[in-house]
Regions:
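Ferredoxin-type iron-sulfur electron-transfer modules in oxidoreductases and energy-metabolism complexes
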Residues: 133-176
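Short, well-ordered secondary-structure micro-motifs
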Residues: 13, 127-129, 160
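Active-site loop ensemble at the mouth of alpha/beta enzyme cores that anchors a bound cofactor
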Residues: 20-32, 129-143
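Short, structural beta-strand-to-alpha-helix junction motif
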Residues: 99-104
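Local cysteine-cluster metal-coordination motifs and their immediate loop/turn environment
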Residues: 9-11, 114-124, 164-176
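Terminal amphipathic helices with adjacent charged low-complexity linkers/tails
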Residues: 1, 111-135, 142-144
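Hydrophobic alpha-helical positions that pack around
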Residues: 1-97, 108-110
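A generic structural signal for well-ordered coil/turn residues at beta-strand boundaries
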Residues: 77, 89, 112, 142-143, ...
Length: 176
């Protein structure tokens, strides 16, 4: 079954997601017990994202050796990027690990780009002089978010927006 959560940022954490699915506030649970033994409705539960299940299906179909042959020496397989922001063709893109930021920008139709935020608001901001860097564990690991900012954007305002986002989305357990 596929369930749609409430959409809160904290619900990306597995136990907060389970709380949300149970109709409660999406707050992380104390552990132990872990979801694998006491998860959704106190039943054994596995929580994975769609990308993991998609990769597992391809591995089951084509074999682990095939999958390991995609990507780089230290980052096997593919990565799904959710590309958004100042580009002509936002959307979901799947690349072999090792793709450069410049390649992604070309594919999504980004022009006059000053920066890319990789891995969402808690990730890193990469400036234009670093667009040769690669999406891979050995260079820029990512959770999949890829936000494009062109020259019209005030990067101070972008940073301020991220700070407001975290203030609003905080679950209240982390201290400043």
């Amino acid at each position: 079954e596929i369930h749609v959560g409430a959409g809160a940022y904290i619900c990306g954490e597995e136990s907060a997601l389970i709380e949300s699915l149970e109709g409660k506030r999406g707050t992380p649970r104390n552990r132990p017990p872990f979801p694998v033994t006491n998860g959704y409705l106190d039943q054994p539960t596995i929580v994975n994202n769609v990308e993991t299940f998609a990769a597992a299906a391809l591995i089951a179909l084509n074999g682990g050796e095939w999958y390991a042959g995609i990507g780089t020496k230290h980052s096997a397989g593919t990565k799904i990027l959710s590309v958004s922001g100042d580009c002509e063709r936002p959307g979901l893109y799947e690349y072999p690990f090792g793709v450069s930021i410049a390649e992604v920008l070309a594919d999504c139709g980004a022009g006059d780009t000053q920066a890319v935020q990789v891995s969402g608001p808690s990730g890193i901001c990469v400036s234009a002089d670093e667009f040769g860097r690669r999406i891979a564990f050995e260079d820029i690991p990512t959770a999949g978010a890829f936000m494009v900012f062109d020259q019209r954007r005030d990067m101070f305002e972008v940073a301020r927006n991220f700070v407001h986002f975290f203030a609003h989305e905080s679950c209240g357990f982390c201290t400043p």
